[in-house]
Structures are given as structure tokens and as C-alpha cells.
UniProtKB/Swiss-Prot annotation:
The gene is argH1. Pathway: Amino-acid biosynthesis; L-arginine biosynthesis; L-arginine from L-ornithine and carbamoyl phosphate: step 3/3. It comes from Rhizobium meliloti (strain 1021) (Ensifer meliloti). Keywords: Amino-acid biosynthesis, Arginine biosynthesis, Cytoplasm, Lyase. This is Argininosuccinate lyase 1. It holds the Pfam family Lyase_1. One of its GO terms (molecular function) is argininosuccinate lyase activity. Disulfide bonds: none annotated.
Amino acid sequence: MADGSSETKSSNQMWGGRFASGPDAIMEEINASIGFDKKLYAQDIRGSIAHATMLAHQGIISAEDKDKIVHGLDTILSEIDSGAFEFSRRLEDIHMNIEARLAALIGPAAGRLHTARSRNDQVALDFRLWVKEELQKTEKALTGLIAAFLDRAEEHAETVMPGFTHLQTAQPVTFGHHCMAYVEMFGRDRARVRHAIEHMDESPIGAAALAGTGFPIDRHMTAKALGFREPTRNSIDTVSDRDFALEFLSIAAIAATHLSRLAEEIVIWSTPQFGFIRLSDAFSTGSSIMPQKKNPDAAELVRAKTGRVNGSLVALLTVMKGLPLAYSKDMQEDKEQVFDAAESLELAIAAMTGMIRDVTIRADRMKAAAGSGYSTATDLADWLVREAGLPFRDAHHVTGRVVALAEQKGCDLADLPLAELQAINSAITDKVYGVLTVEASVASRTSFGGTAPSEVRKQIAWWRARN
């Protein structure tokens, strides 16, 4: 055998009965998942306790063996929590590491734990429990982010700023209204989280390898003990399924995309050229060479982490796309994608919540910019429709000529003399000046969901009652 490739003296004791020799060292390395799936230890122990309790209740194992198993598992949980537990790559994964330690602690009774169970349904359970718990954390984190935006929206319901399309000044809006747009976005993310929790609320344990088991188990009992609504209905689908992980990654990718869009605006708005916001020192960094710099690194890192989260979704979709039904070892590659995406999303939400709570809003700069770029041109067109009876397309054309005149003269629309306005369209009167201020513009947008402060406060109240 070539250098760097050797066999272990014996095969894995948990499955090696039909093997004459152990795996090659490279096989052992590629096969092992303990380096990352040890993160599932609490879920694995919780599932094993529920399984052992059910086996005893059904008379499949003795109450005495069940008590030994539960006591041993509690001991192992304490060992792992304290850092005293030694994980072994030779034992491949978290399931067999725990089972081997259990055998060392309680002897032959440990061998009864795996009755009516396979690692296929065991890992499906552990992973599903972990994802469910992570979704619950994400729901709580999103609720905190929404609350931060609601507070800023309430504070700035009347703060006027430019609204943009194509990153060009479009119409005046309020900063409170802009904040509420993010409330809606992150509210949808939270709704997706809640739906996913409900959608995946089925227990896989008891499906065994793929065909179920001939032992008289009670899957409803274990489902209830583990906090699931009910057991899964098809044993083949149960061990084939990673939809719950894909749903989590999809939710994470959409939420991360929303966070990235927010991060982009924070980066832009904090530049001297915009100057709409001032980031706190707590969420900024400096430069090693330029002493004047205050960099929005937290926002930039949130923006960058979106690529990692999106990549995790694509990676797992690609893993799953060619698999026949039931378990394939490919599915071992599911966890690192989810673990990494969950960590990235959790950190990104926390960072963004902190930035939103701490950021200083420069209302004077926002208001000054709100009137730039002829942002009240639509108000002029609307006035021509209401007061002069013009069809909107004609009003649009007239307003375009007015904007061209203002550009030529280098002034705002409100600074054009009435005579020059009337030279373009004789129906224009001095009352038009009343709609050309940014304050009048936002106050007039009273349609449901509009930017008028009165509407923004209604939006805030609606969300306060639901957050």
C-alpha cells in the first residue's frame, strides 16, 4: 500500500460485522462528519431519550435498561457541555460517538437503544430539531429588527427625504415611510419563518432505514415528546427529505438579500456626498493610514455575507438534485451549508439591529436633498389634472417642459415666475406653488400605504399590534 494510505486494524464496531478489514485512512477522513455534526449533540441526546422512553413504554426494552440509557445520556450531555467529552473521527459521526460512550458507561444496555431505529431517521430527526430551533431564534431576531425600525419610523414619521428610483431623485417621501418599507420586507421574512416552522413540524423518528420497522413502536408518542405536531406519514420520504433544510436556506437567502439592500443604502447614505446618516462608533471602523476615515464595515460585511448564504442554498440544491429516494451519503453534505448560513444570518441581523438603533439621522441633509432633482414634478402634473382638467399624459408633457425650463434657468420649480409657467400652459395659476414644496408633496400622499405622515402612523400602529 502506498505511503499516506493505510488501513485501520479493524472496521467500525457499530457496523463492521460483514467487513474483513477496516477502512483506508483516506476513506475514514472523507467519511467522517464528527468535525461538524457534533453541533447536533443536544438534539441527538434528546431524540435518544425520547426513543428509549417509548421503547420501554411499548415493552420493547425493559424499564431498567431504559433508566440506564437515560442516565448515561444525561451524563454524556454534561460531559459534552463541559468540554470533557473526547470526539473520535474513527467513530464517524455524532450518533456513533455518543453510542460508543454510552456503551462504555452502562455496558450492554446501550446496545438496545438502536432497536427500531436507523441513523437515517436519527440524523433526519437531529437535523430537523436543530433547524426548527434555529428558525425560532431567527423569528425572535427578526422581531427585534422590526421593533428597531418601528421605533425609528415613529420618530421620523414627518422627516422628509428624497425617494429614489434608479438611485435618481424621484419624489419626496418620509424617512418613517422608508423605514416601514423595511418593516414590510422583514415582516415577510418572519412570516416565512413561521410558516416553515409549521410546515416542518413532523417527527422523522421511527421511519428507520427507509421501510419502517416491525417492532410495535409508537411514533405519535415520540413526536409528542419531542415537541412535534405529528409523525411523518411516509417512511421513504422521511429519510429522503431535506426540504426543511432547503426551506431554511431559502428563507435565509431572501432575508439576507433584504439585509444586503439595507446595507447598501447605509453605505451610500453614510458617505459625505449623501450625508443622510451618521453611523455610531460601535458599528464603524477606521483606517490604518487615513486618520479621518470612518468606515461602514459592519454594513459592508452584512452585504458580503449574503453571498455566503445564497451560495449555501445553491450548494444544497445541487447536492439534492440528483439523488434517488431514501438516504445517500451525499446528504452528509447538507449540514455545513445550513450551519454556516444560520451563523451568517444570525450575526447579520444582530449587526443590522444594532446599526438601526444607534444610527444618527441627519434630517436637515435629508430635507435639503428631498427637493433636488425636481422631485415635486409629479405634484405639478397631478395639479394640472385636478385643477386644469388636463389628461395625465398631457399634464406629463407640460410638466416636462416646465422641468426643462427650470434646468435651463438653474432653479427649482417653485422659483419659476408665474408668467413663464403660464407661457407654457395658460391654465397654470399662482395656486400651483402650494403643491411644489416637499412638505406639501408628502402630506398629499394619503392613499392607503402612502408616504403621508398620517398614513405612516397608521402603518406603524398596524405593525405595533402584530409585533
